[in-house]
Amino acid sequence: MNTSLKWIKALVPGLDCGVQEYVDAMTLSGSKVEGYEQLDADLDKIVVGQVTKIEKHPDADKLVICQVNVGSETLQIVTGAPNVFEGAKVPVVLDGGRVAGGHDGTKTPGGIKIKKGKLRGVESSGMMCSIEELGSNREMFPDAPENGLYIFDEDAPVGENAVAYLGLDDSVVEYEITSNRVDCFSVLGIAREAAATFHKEFVPPVVTETGNNEDVNDYIKVSVKDQDLCSRYTARVVKNIKFAPSPKWMQERLRAHGIRPINNLVDITNYVMEEYGQPMHAYDLDTIEGKEIIVRRAAAGEKFVTLDGQERQLDENVLMICDAKKAVGIAGIMGGENSMITDHVTTMLFEAACFDGTNIRKSGKRIGLRTDASAKFEKGLDPNLAMEAMNRACQLVEELGVGEVVGGAVDIYPVKREGVKLPFEPDKYNKLLGTDIPAGDMIGYFEKIDLGYDEATNEILVPSWRQDLLCDADMAEEVARFYGYDKIGTSLPSGESTAGGKSFKLRMEEKAREIAEFCGFSQAMTYSFESPKVFDKLLIPEDSKWRKTVVISNPLGEDYSIMRTLPLNGMLTSLSTNFGRRNKDVRLYEMGNIYLPKQLPLTELPEERMQLTFGMYGDGDFFTMKGVIEELLYQTGLRKKAQYDPHAELPFLHPGRKAAIVYDGAVIGYLGEVHPTVAANYAIKERVYIAVIDMPEIVSRASFDYKYEGITNFPVSSRDLSMVVPKNILVGDIEKVFEENGGKYLENYELFDVYEGEQIEKGFKSVAYSLKFRGKDKNLEESDITGAMDKILSGLKNIGIQLRG
């Protein structure tokens, strides 16, 4: 929201501070200021001058010598401007003055200083300016020539400050207005805040009654078919319209707000929209068939040509303004080409309404059109504003001589919105703020922002336009804003407090993050929504459960239209970005949800499951990733050996380098090398490894209860096993035999050799393990170890494994 400081000061007469003081104070009172632009910051010593005489330059065909009256004296100025003429009133920069930039519109920080000098041997004492050199442009000053000096109107006073005469002696302040403060999307709303901040009187315009003795109902009838989408519709008629430029003061304020002045009628609608925050629209009444306005939904497939000449495809959710036979406007967004105001209009219809903000936003998105008006409606306007803005516009019509306002107004307002009443509880406000502000001071703050106080009921009367004030905390915030956040000291919370702590689930997730970072992984955060095309990139079959997704009803676009059922796309996209930027040895992890619908179409919320995803390329391989997973399991209290199932259906992983992770009989995740085709789909030209852990499975088995055991004094006994193993038997199968048959003395086992070669029969491999046995309370005897080894060998034989001879 951009606002002219001069306009604010006109509504708050006692406000005489500079722009920096204003910005600082408004920010402290809660009206966050993003920045400001001082329009005349780089302009100095520029006056209105009048050319009294022109002579040819003796040594340059394209230059002329002008005598220019600047009020206090007549200066000689050499110029090459093609549009200079005797009698012209122009902006003149005096010797030592500054302009904002060049005539091509480029601005120079600090401006360009103008000095007296000679041009082709002839002395020149100053410079006459184009509008671009004054820091503006032809869009804001359409009467300015494309190439030449800016020519003032004949009434411009010679010798006066040209910057002030053009209205450039102003500052434009940019605010960040949150969506709950709809009232501040207007000059009046900001001015009310400024008056309260600086303890000055707020003087809004006094709107007087307008209209002749005729009845508007003789000119137009209105019916609203969809009152859920249009809570209020007001209309008035203006006849005998006379188009002319709007007055100088109005043009200056519109320019400061970035709005190009057009003519008196159009400028009034734009002016009122900025002043009140209420969009308005004008229709050529002679084009309204049947002299009837009908507010209804569009028909499915209906087409409509808007003011910009574009044909729009509509559906039944778009609200339309229609006459007896056709549509004449898209409600709250843009009028139609068929009812636009032209220079030949003599009678027009003014519209000010309150349309449903959500519908306006969705409609604009459907038809691909967003305007200044729709942006304001989207926020959710106060319907009580519509008639105030309408009457203000009609007042300006009469004051500026635009036309004759017909008496009366159409006002369809079936359910009036009232303000709310909140109990006045100063003790609660002080407790929330840690202050001791008197109740009388609080009431004073409320009255400054037009909140009433009913002494009989001890209630605060909140007007309908303050939709953000709903509870004690909101009222305490208003007290803090105008008491001054900078005056509130530091204090400890009063009252009783209860001990709290993080949940076990949260603590376990934090532990998992710590382990990931300990293993050299950096955290990534990616979107939870993605494109349906992701499944093709990941080689997911058409009938896969992973393709059953939650579809977003209002997506940002097709690429963000479903909720993810796999965490892989975000991780692979992040790895691809790093690879594309030539980053080497990248390790990333992400802790994020997947969304699994219980049934489709949705009848209840989908299941959200937290998953920990690892991804890496470069300095690691499958076994590096496996080691990371085993470290994670061990550090979270899962001390049993995990099993790895290579037969799991994981189409996005390499068929020979993948496995589901099985712990205690349950699948808790998967890991492997990304399928080469998938890696190519993500433009990664290295081997990529990923692992995914289902955190609920970890949390349900994890423990922070560590069991400490003393260091035994008894020695370890080792036995080496060299086996001939069929190739189809996995290492996990061998280790399962060790676990089941090793007995209580088997402390550890370690694979130290795998061999395939000439001395090994085809279809077999040689595998060697070192097994370590230790007693906790005694030295082991040979019989203890032999008994365990016999059971192990028997178990190995049962699955087709023999000792190597």
Segments the model singles out, each with a brief description of its role:
Residues 1-214, 349, 368, 372, ...:
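Phosphate-backbone binding interfaces of nucleic-acid-interacting proteins
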Residues 5, 24, 64, 202-302:
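Glycine/proline-enriched, intrinsically flexible loops and inter-domain linkers
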Residues 40-44, 211-212, 497-502, 526-545, ...:
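Beta-rich nucleic-acid/ligand-interaction surfaces
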Residues 48-78, 158, 263, 269-338:
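Conserved mixed alpha/beta core segments that line enzyme active sites in large multi-domain catalysts
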Residues 120-129, 133-135, 144, 148-150, ...:
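Mobile "lid/hinge" segments at catalytic clefts and subdomain interfaces of large enzymes
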Residues 189, 422-584, 719, 772-775, ...:
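Extended, well-folded interaction surfaces typified by the phenylalanyl-tRNA synthetase beta subunit core
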Residues 198-224, 401-429, 436:
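Terminal amphipathic helices with adjacent charged low-complexity linkers/tails
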Residues 448-451, 598-602, 607-608, 613, ...:
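A carboxyl-terminal module marker
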